[in-house]
């Protein structure tokens, strides 16, 4: 589960780089939404992993 938390976090960072830096001007809105979605998924996966004790 921790693996998935790290994967979601990396995807969130990549989406943030594209969305907040203006590299992909046409996809700014989508990148910002993806950043939030994957950041929430990363946090949720990390918390579930901690609660399971693995």
Swiss-Prot record:
Pfam family, one: DUF1328
Keywords: Cell membrane, Membrane, Transmembrane, Transmembrane helix
Gene Ontology, cellular component aspect: plasma membrane
Topology in the lipid bilayer: Multi-pass membrane protein
Stretches that traverse the bilayer: 5-25, 28-48
Principal cellular location given in the protein's record: membrane
InterPro entries: DUF1328
Compartments (UniProt record): Cell membrane
Source organism superkingdom: Bacteria
Stated family: Belongs to the UPF0391 family.
Identification of the protein by name: UPF0391 membrane protein Tbd_2238
């Amino acid at each position: 589960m921790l693996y998935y938390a790290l994967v979601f976090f990396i995807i969130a960072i990549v989406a943030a780089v594209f969305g907040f830096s203006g590299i992909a001007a046409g996809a700014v809105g989508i990148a910002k939404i993806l950043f939030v979605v994957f950041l929430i998924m990363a946090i949720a996966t990390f918390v579930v992993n901690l609660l399971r004790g693995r």
